[in-house]
Amino acid sequence: MATSPAVIDVETIRKAQRAEGPATILAIGTATPANCVYQADYPDYYFRVTESEHMVDLKEKFQRMCDKSMIRKRYMHITEEFLKENPSMCKFMAPSLDARQDLVVVEVPKLGKEAATKAIKEWGFPKSKITHLVFCTTSGVDMPGADYQLTKLLGLRPSVKRLMMYQQGCFAGGTVLRLAKDLAENNKGARVLVVCSEITAVTFRGPNEGHLDSLVGQALFGDGAAAVIIGSDPDLSVERPLFEMVSAAQTILPDSEGAIDGHLKEVGLTFHLLKDVPALIAKNIEKALIQAFSPLNINDWNSIFWIAHPGGPAILDQVEFKLGLREEKLRASRHVLSEYGNMSSACVLFILDEMRKKSIKDGKTTTGEGLEWGVLFGFGPGLTVETVVLHSLPATISVATQN
């Protein structure tokens, strides 16, 4: 007599579909355009290419902004030659969206490919093992999107599961990690390629006396792309885990509406910033820390490593002062701000890369400057704050980290 097959319930299937361990960052890659702009030279360059040299007082203000920015250099895709061919981008409010779009829909995925290729090489497995792609950029809304274009450029499997995030802003480096954590932990064997690619061509424009907040953006923003590969239950015969993600949260700060916003118009992406942004972040950051670290019984903010989005020097300074952080706590964040400027969502991933490389170079025992626990903060429009709790891992030397 034939026996009936065993009935498998939904709960059994559900458990089989999920990973056992936490989401882990397995590789990091970064890329920038070739065109390097030094901050000391930028005021002269900016006012020349925008034909604004007659605005002597405004140029002096911009010079002071650049001097106080703590930025040494930035990378930008747009060059003087490109701006000569597209003069509408140099006017303050001239219709120019078509020229901007034509550039970024092509160049954003291309720059993302450079970073992703480096991450895949470090990771060690063939790209065919990538199961999910999360792509994030502030610019170039298009259909099919940059996620599709990157899938084609990299030669990923057509069945890769894609998620495209447009126009989130500076907090989104934390958002992509939060999403990748959920994907990796809820899909056994998943390997998530996360790419943030940012090009400032959508926000570049000439100066205007009545819009100093726009001028602040011209002094801070740079171009860059970063990629990470995230998965649970690493295969230690090939993969070299860097950081484990313990928890991730997002919140909107109270009384912060309109503090940072951006609007896509015929003139490109306009940017608005209120002066009290650093104070709003500093006022609310300890609450986010307490919520994130109370399960770990940690309340000494100098005992953890720090990866904070460097929106500008004032944000870092006020957070440092408010929490009584030692100067070295925000070293990695300040280093990336100095060498690359504010690259929006890509910044925190650049800082992750800087931290693990410097930890190895300095002979630290872990990827988190020798410490066990750390925090990654993203700040941006809303004001929105992303908080990711990280657990560092033993520092090991790989070919990628020596480059």
Curated annotation (Swiss-Prot):
It comes from Gerbera hybrida. PROSITE patterns: CHALCONE_SYNTH (PS00441). GO terms for molecular function: naringenin-chalcone synthase activity. InterPro entries: Chalcone/stilbene_synt_C, Chalcone/stilbene_synt_N, Chalcone/stilbene_synthase_AS, Polyketide_synthase_type-III, Thiolase-like. GO terms for biological process: flavonoid biosynthetic process; polyketide biosynthetic process. Pfam families: Chal_sti_synt_C, Chal_sti_synt_N. Its EC number is 2.3.1.74. Keywords: Acyltransferase, Flavonoid biosynthesis, Transferase. Pathway: Secondary metabolite biosynthesis; flavonoid biosynthesis. The gene is CHS3. The active site is at residue 170. The primary product of this enzyme is 4,2',4',6'-tetrahydroxychalcone (also termed naringenin-chalcone or chalcone) which can under specific conditions spontaneously isomerize into naringenin. This is Chalcone synthase 3. The lineage of its organism: Eukaryota, Viridiplantae, Streptophyta, Embryophyta, Tracheophyta. Belongs to the thiolase-like superfamily. Chalcone/stilbene synthases family. It catalyses: (E)-4-coumaroyl-CoA + 3 malonyl-CoA + 3 H(+) = 2',4,4',6'-tetrahydroxychalcone + 3 CO2 + 4 CoA.
